[in-house]
């Protein structure tokens, strides 16, 4: 059996960096090199301050960096020396041309394939790690075949990641399963077994599943679509709960105890975010349309539509509770990452809520413990989010949550950071304008509602009526939809 001794990973982002750090940690005899064209990102990986925040990541990196784990911008040499090359580059949703707003843009995958074949010789395994549409492996193989040379044998595998940001290291060290897809040929199966041997250093063999490449690619899209579907499903019920007086948490607990349903991903919120869920569901929608399956496409499109509705509904609730205007009012936004325990802001609901409030003229004071000021400004300066000098006029980045809340009309919790449960809300209430509102978009304060109301707060949360003096709000349809996929990024003023 072919033995993998050197691994190269192209892409030092949220997938490539943590994944290869754990592989190096678990396989000390394998030399792992993570490469990227972004020099500042590589410099960060080689510094005490890593470019991404993930619990446990720093300890893993420091345990093997400089021993068998290396970060470099020398892509060509890393490819030449490697037995296995992971492709772990971004596959964003297209913002132009055919499939705009839905199809995956594979230009970075194609660029990697061409660079790999140019710098390869002998036998090498090339593995998709990025989330890609079905048959992407076939496209890579066609590029390899069209540019082949003597004594070159490149085998293409699919090995999608199933880690969740915030628990990535735990997920990588103890995965539910490892999925490897390859050709159903002797050469393809040889490559599959070689990659299996790497994971068998720490993953039980029964947890390593092998399929053909198409099944592997579709499994990743389907997994994310099902998880997003569960969130949209419980969010739809949260709207019904608010209209009837039910509590969505109680409903979720009741149905989650049914073993056929389970209790995972039944947390109602202001909406899902992150780099994968929306992108992958839209990719699935586009695939179904391309294969002439319109009913299936419409079914999955509803997952995205419900997520958009939940965000617009929450923004409407804020505006209408504040006497139907937020113009020139200070509003504290607590949390900007798409979920706790990560600094990732991609498709974060905070961006959408901020956009809706800025359009109404609100002055936003934003605090997040892990998202740097520059990232918040970049996200809010997207042309689909803000206009001209809107961010400079309306957005302030606060150094702590108390500064953000000082003099505010309302506090809006958009990320479920644990620290928000521990804040001194009496101190916050004293410095806010009255009536003081808290809009809990993540239900992190569920156990504190009575205490907060005693202090004097008016509480609005997802899927439950809390404040008795509730002002009816306008239909969410009055807030127009927008998408971060609509336009290319512009250079922000930081």
Curated annotation (Swiss-Prot):
Residues 88-110, 466-494 are annotated as: Disordered. Residues 129-135 are annotated as: Allosteric switch region. It catalyses: UDP-alpha-D-glucose + 2 NAD(+) + H2O = UDP-alpha-D-glucuronate + 2 NADH + 3 H(+). Homohexamer. This is UDP-glucose 6-dehydrogenase. SMART domains: UDPG_MGDP_dh_C. UDP-alpha-D-xylose (UDX) acts as a feedback inhibitor. It binds at the same site as the substrate, but functions as allosteric inhibitor by triggering a conformation change that disrupts the active hexameric ring structure and gives rise to an inactive, horseshoe-shaped hexamer. NAD(+) binds at residues 11-16, 36, 41, 89-93, 130-132, 165, 276-279, 346. Its EC number is 1.1.1.22.
């Amino acid at each position: 059996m072919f033995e993998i001794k050197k691994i190269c990973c192209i892409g030092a982002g949220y997938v490539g960096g943590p994944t290869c750090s754990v592989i190096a940690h678990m396989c000390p005899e394998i030399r792992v090199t993570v490469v990227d064209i972004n020099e500042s990102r590589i410099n960060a990986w080689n510094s005490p301050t890593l470019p991404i925040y993930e619990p446990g990541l720093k300890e893993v990196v420091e345990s093997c960096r400089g021993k068998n784990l290396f970060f470099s911008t020398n892509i060509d040499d890393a490819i030449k020396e490697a037995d296995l090359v992971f492709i772990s580059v971004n596959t964003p949703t297209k913002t132009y041309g055919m499939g705009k707003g839905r199809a995956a843009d594979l230009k970075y995958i194609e660029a990697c394939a061409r660079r790999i074949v140019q710098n390869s010789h002998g036998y090498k395994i090339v593995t998709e790690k990025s989330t890609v549409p079905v048959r992407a492996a076939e496209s890579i193989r066609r590029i390899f075949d069209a540019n082949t040379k003597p004594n070159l044998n490149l085998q293409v595998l699919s090995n999608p990641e199933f880690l969740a940001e915030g628990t990535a290291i735990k997920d990588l060290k103890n995965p539910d399963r490892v999925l490897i897809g390859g050709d159903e040929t002797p050469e393809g199966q040889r490559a599959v077994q070689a990659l299996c041997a790497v994971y068998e250093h720490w993953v039980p063999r029964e947890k390593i599943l092998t399929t053909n490449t198409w099944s592997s690619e579709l499994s990743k899209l389907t997994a994310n679509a099902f998880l997003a579907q569960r969130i949209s499903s419980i969010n739809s019920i949260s709207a019904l709960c608010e209209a009837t007086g039910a509590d969505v948490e109680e409903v979720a607990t009741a149905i989650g105890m049914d073993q056929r349903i389970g209790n995972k991903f039944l947390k109602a919120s202001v909406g899902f975010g992150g780099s994968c869920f929306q992108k992958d569901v839209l990719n699935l929608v586009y695939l179904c349309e391309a294969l002439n399956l319109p009913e299936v496409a419409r079914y999955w499109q509803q997952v995205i539509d419900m997520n958009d509705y939940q965000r617009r509904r929450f923004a409407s609730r804020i505006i209408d509770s504040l006497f139907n205007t937020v113009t020139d009012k200070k509003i504290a936004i607590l949390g900007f990452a798409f979920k706790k325990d990560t600094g990732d802001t991609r498709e974060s609901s905070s961006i959408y809520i901020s956009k809706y409030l800025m359009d109404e003229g609100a002055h936003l004071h934003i605090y997040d413990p892990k998202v740097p000021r520059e990232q918040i400004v970049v996200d809010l300066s997207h042309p689909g989010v803000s206009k001209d000098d809107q961010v400079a006029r309306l957005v302030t980045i606060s150094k702590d949550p108390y500064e953000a809340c000082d003099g505010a009309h309302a506090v809006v919790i958009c990320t479920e950071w644990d620290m928000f449960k521990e804040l001194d809300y009496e101190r916050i209430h004293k410095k806010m304008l009255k009536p003081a509102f808290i809009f809990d978009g993540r239900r992190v304060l569920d156990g504190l509602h009575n205490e907060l109301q005693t202090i004097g707060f008016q509480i609005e949360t997802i899927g439950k009526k809390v404040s008795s003096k509730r002002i009816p709000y306008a239909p969410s349809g009055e807030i127009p939809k927008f998408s971060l996929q609509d336009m290319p990024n512009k250079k922000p003023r930081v």
